[in-house]
Curated annotation (Swiss-Prot):
Family: Belongs to the pyruvate, phosphate/water dikinase regulatory protein family. PSRP subfamily.
Entry EC no(s): 2.7.11.33, 2.7.4.28
Enzyme class: transferase
Function statement: Bifunctional serine/threonine kinase and phosphorylase involved in the regulation of the phosphoenolpyruvate synthase (PEPS) by catalyzing its phosphorylation/dephosphorylation.
Protein name as annotated: Putative phosphoenolpyruvate synthase regulatory protein
Reactions catalysed: [pyruvate, water dikinase] + ADP = [pyruvate, water dikinase]-phosphate + AMP + H(+); [pyruvate, water dikinase]-phosphate + phosphate + H(+) = [pyruvate, water dikinase] + diphosphate
InterPro entries on file: Kinase-pyrophosphorylase, PSRP
UniProt: ADP binding residues: G153, V154, S155, R156, C157, G158, K159, T160
Gene Ontology MF terms: ADP binding; ATP binding; phosphotransferase activity, phosphate group as acceptor; protein serine/threonine kinase activity
NCBIfam families reported in the protein's UniProt record: PRK05339.1
Keywords attached to this entry: Kinase, Nucleotide-binding, Serine/threonine-protein kinase, Transferase
Amino acid sequence: MERSVFYVSDGTAITAEVLGHAVLSQFPVNTVSYTLPFVESEVRAKAVCEQINTLYQQTGVRPLVFYSIVTPTVRNIITSSDGFCQDIVQALVAPLQEELNIPPTPVANRTHGLTANNLGKYDARIAAIDYTLAHDDGISLRNLDQAQVILLGVSRCGKTPTSLYLAMQFGIRAANYPFIADDMDNLRLPDALKPFQHKLFGLTIDAERLAAIREERRGNSRYASLRQCRMELNEVEALFRKHQIKYLNTTNYSVEEISAKIIDILGMSRRMY
């Protein structure tokens, strides 16, 4: 079964996408997604409504519509469409209003927009991203005292995407350091990292998966061979055990899951932005 899914919002549509994906993941259904942010005017809403209706007429299957829109007139246009419309925020607002005993004050773009209240947090997140980019793949070993976590692992085991996700999603300053083939003859923990052992966290991966990833990057090479991958992983995991560095096999985890596990295992403060 395949269903069309619309994520419609008067803001970035990130909230609609995240919650919509979370709900749909519970069902064995294939989807074709349409993300429509900044639907703030009636003109724009009517165009979206027409798009939904046209798709319904073409396929005969009612599109699913997850929306988050503050302005009533704009919201009503969307809900008048032929789609199966679900307000992904309002379902939680009513019971929360009863519990807090205060009415909500809806404001467009509040979730991911800049306000006087969150400007400092935003600046901290941008600083974390800048730091992470400057300390990617062992580019710099300076200012490691400012890092909140230092990821270690062989090439292509997920260090860079995980570091960037930690910075962008949680404002965590994440450095990462690669162990390459040339290190394997005399693998050791670099002196520059030793003072920060409490910040070190290792990433590993199944050799077969690593070989497949490397094959896409550099096919038919020693670098991508299964034998080379196994050797590197064995050496690096032995190093982790020797220095009592906590580590995680990333083979069956998404970058979101890897990041959440690192935060949990290291007992780090988890801040959403």
